[in-house]
């Protein structure tokens, strides 16, 4: 009888672990995080609250200046399809350069050139990506930007299985 009870508990524990492991999904998407998403995430992470009106206004002024300075120095961006995403949406997309990403999102939480680590982060998408990816930048909460020698070639995001879809 005691063995049967132990087997039942072991089966339940394994089932719970299997369910918990499958709650997150890595999805490959063409658009990365917006600058405002990172700002809000960092505010919650550091202050455990939403940014105040003054903090938002100050951040928007700083971001306007950074984007304006970058666009003055890189006028060729205006003729690309990424221009609207960069200037108005302030969002990184496939094709964005490292400098554009740093302008919008600041420095990454982690950078790697290790193929094994990148394969772990990309999961099921790695076989398609591995030929062109040279480096990965990680941004919270679950964004990974994959670069070739020049720009972003792929973007993945780890989301909960039950997160809302936008």
Where does each model-flagged region fall?
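Residues within mature, well-folded domains
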Residues: 20-166
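Positively charged n-region of N-terminal signal peptides that target proteins for export
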Residues: 1-6
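Bacterial N-terminal signal peptides
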Residues: 7-16
